[in-house]
């Protein structure tokens, strides 16, 4: 429902490309791109911590070359607008590349916002902790529903598929 709501709000907006922010924004990016009929999809990955230590500046692990962003209207998709640090860093980098960033997120958490700014588009406001069905590391150990991918060890990618029904069903099918 949140993706549908956000897609409806964005449907009249012209975008040249969609930039999904890893990790939490990648699945919403794919769903929004599908809903909007967008084909030019890029990704960005930003790191603010090394281990437990906060870094003084964000480190971009992945970002599109400036030439792909220059003169483009870029829909930046974040999974959650929480402290705003990630969105701020990505937005600034798109601007430095000569692009026009427009930030969209499913939930906006105004109470956690560290600066007086808001996403350009969002589906809903919330104060709640947001846990998406695809964020398996947020689930208590051993509580993965059957049918879900589960991590096979610390720091390892989900590989084992358990038998059973899918993790999460919506009225429109499996998500």
Report each predicted region and the residues it spans:
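PRPP-associated nucleotide enzymes
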Residues: 1-175
């Amino acid at each position: 429902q949140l993706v549908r709501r956000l897609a409806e709000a964005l449907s009249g907006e012209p975008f040249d490309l969609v930039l999904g922010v890893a990790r939490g924004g990648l699945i919403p990016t794919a769903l929004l791109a599908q809903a909007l009929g967008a084909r030019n999809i890029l990704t960005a990955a930003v790191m603010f911590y090394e281990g437990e230590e906060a870094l003084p500046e964000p480190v971009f692990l992945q970002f599109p070359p400036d030439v792909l962003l220059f003169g483009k209207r870029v829909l930046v998709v974040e999974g959650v607008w929480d402290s705003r640090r990630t969105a701020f860093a990505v937005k600034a980098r798109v601007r430095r590349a000569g692009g026009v960033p427009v930030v969209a997120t499913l939930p906006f958490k105004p109470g956690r916002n560290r600066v007086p700014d808001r996403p350009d588009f969002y589906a809903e406001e919330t104060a709640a902790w947001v846990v998406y069905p695809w964020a398996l590391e947020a689930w208590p150990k051993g509580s993965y529903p059957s049918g879900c991918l589960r991590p096979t060890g610390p720091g390892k990618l989900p590989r084992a598929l358990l038998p059973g029904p899918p993790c999460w069903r919506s009225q429109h099918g499996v998500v």
